[in-house]
Amino acid sequence: MKVTISQINPKTLDFEYNFNLIQEKIKESDVDSLIIFPELSLSGSPLYDSISYNDTHNKSIQYADKLSELKKDFIFGLPINQNGEILNALAFIENGELKAISTKKNLNRFDKGFSLGEGFCTIEYKKQTIAFGFLEDLDEYLKKQDKADLIICSSNILFTPETQKELLTSLQPKIRKAKTPIVLVNRCGAEASYIFNGSSFFMLSNGDLSKELPLFEESSLQIDTQKTEKYTQSPLCRIEKMYHAAVLGIKDYFRKNNIKKALLGLSGGIDSALVVVLAVEALGKENVIGVLLPSEYSTSHSITDAKASAENLGIEYYTIPIKETFTSALKALSPIFEGKEPNVAEENLQSRIRGMILMGIANKIGAALLNTTNKSELSVGYGTLYGDTNGAIGALGDIFKTDVWEMSRWINRKEEIIPQNSIIKAPSAELRPDQKDTDSLPDYDILDKVLFLHLEQSFINF
C-alpha cells in the first residue's frame, strides 16, 4: 500500500491557510496514495477556548466539505461537534466520502474543552485492515490485540531534545509485540511558546525504523508499507536540536503574526549575543535591528563586544546612551530618594529606561522586541519587571544559562560569530560598579542542575 506522510505546519484558526496547505499536499501526492496529516491539521492547535466558538465549528465543516471535493484518499484532523459534545477527531476520506472517524479518548493538556472520544477506529481499505487514531490512544488499542495490517497515528508532539528518542524507545517493543507496522504523523512548527518537532516516521513490524522525516521542517514522503528497508538515523546533537528549535520559534512567531522586523538590546553579554544570531538565522540580517544602551556602569569591552556582535552578522544597529535619561529620572525622584542609600531601585531604574527606549523604538518602526532572558534567570526571577523582561517573545526562555554558553561555542565551532569575550567573561547586569550575577545567584553550573531537577524532572524533596 502506498502511504504519503504529510508533515505540515498549520496556523491556529487560520482555516483558509490550512485548507490551502492540505489541498496543495493532496494534489502533489500520487492518485493511489493514502495521505496522512497530523492531529488538528485543519484548525491548527492548541485551540483552548476557541473550540467552543460557533465560528470554529462552522469553518471546520465548511473547509472539511471543500476537502472532500478533491476526490482523494486521506486522513486529516479537525474538531467536530457530535450531539453537543466537542471532540478531537480524525476523518478518513475515501474518494470524497467520509468513511470513518476516530475521536480522541485519552486527552492531554492541549485538549482542554474537548469531551472524551471513543479511541481508535478500524476500517477496511484496499483489501487491508487499517487501525487509525491518536498517539495517546495507541496503548489502549494495542491492549485489545486486534489484528490490523497497518496502524496509523496522528499527533502533535511537543519538542524536547529527547522527545524522539524517548518515543521510539517506548514504541519499538510495543510494535514488535503487535507485529504490525505503524505510520506516525506529527506536525512541525511553532505556536506561541510551543515547538512541535515533526520527525514523523514509518516503523516496520519488527520495530525497526524504516523512514523518518526531518526535524522542524514541512515535508512529505511517500512510502510503500510492503517494503522492509531499514533506516539508519544520523541524529543531531542535543544543542543543535535546541538551536534549530529556538530559530523555528522566532521564525514562526513573526511569520504567523505578520511581523517583519525584530529589535533587541545588545549589551555585549552572552544572552543578547546568542539571541541576535538566532534572530538573523530566523529572519535574515536585513530584518534585525540592534540597540546598544550603555550606562556609566557599562565597561568598554561590553560596548566593543556588542558592536562586534552586530558587525559580525551585518545587522543595522544604533547606540543610545542612557546616562542623561537616568540622571533626569534620579532628579525627578530626588524628593523621595534623597538621603537614602542607593539600592536595587536605582539598578532597576536603568533597566526600565532601557526597556522604555526599546519599546518606544519597536512601536515607532513596527518591530517586535525580542526578550533575551534565559531560563535560569527567568526561573529564579533574576530580572526587572518592565525592563529586561520586556519583549514579545523570549528566545531563550527555555534554554538554561549553561546551555546558552554551550550553544554559543557550538555556533563558533567553525568561525567566531559570537565574540569570544562575550562567552568567557563573567556574566553581569552592569547596573552597579563591578556587579556580577554571582553576587545574587549561585554559580550557573550549580543553579542549572537544581533547576533541571525541579523543572524538567519534577524532583521535590522538602
Regions found by a protein language model. Give the residues of each.
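ATP/NTP-dependent adenylation/nucleotidyl-transfer catalytic domains that generate, transfer
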Residues: 126, 179, 205, 231-268, ...
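Enzyme catalytic cores with a strong preference for nitrogen-chemistry domains
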Residues: 1-265, 281-287, 292, 317
